[in-house]
């Protein structure tokens, strides 16, 4: 579960290294987000020469979460870290590579480009 002020690692090569969640999108009173949800973030750490800079406000989709997600068959999937991929308004990633595994739930939310770039889909 990601909420306001949560910090996430960035799982792409857009130039950002760490994000701070500003807002969870999808409803007026929505407090938490999980895998596959879009959030608004501020870039807290960035690498020099990247596409995004420190202080930029970006949209990101959550690809890994410490608090797992329950699947229809009753199983749960949890990850060791909270991670997100920076996306444009049309749900395409701003980076050209994805690092680490991503959850299968992204396919249900129409993030096919992220799923195809990921080295492993769990």
UniProtKB/Swiss-Prot annotation:
Keywords: Ribonucleoprotein, Ribosomal protein, RNA-binding, rRNA-binding
UniProt keyword rRNA-binding present: yes
SUPFAM superfamilies given in the database record: Ribosomal protein L14 (SSF50193)
Transmembrane feature ranges: none
Record flagged with keyword Transferase: no
Record-level Gene Ontology MF annotations: large ribosomal subunit rRNA binding; structural constituent of ribosome
GO biological process: translation
Subunit and partners: Part of the 50S ribosomal subunit. Forms a cluster with proteins L3 and L19. In the 70S ribosome, L14 and L19 interact and together make contacts with the 16S rRNA in bridges B5 and B8.
Function, as annotated: Binds to 23S rRNA. Forms part of two intersubunit bridges in the 70S ribosome.
Family of this protein: Belongs to the universal ribosomal protein uL14 family.
Record-linked HAMAP family: Ribosomal_uL14
NCBIfam families per the UniProt record, alphabetical: rplN_bact (TIGR01067)
Protein name: Large ribosomal subunit protein uL14
Gene of this entry: rplN
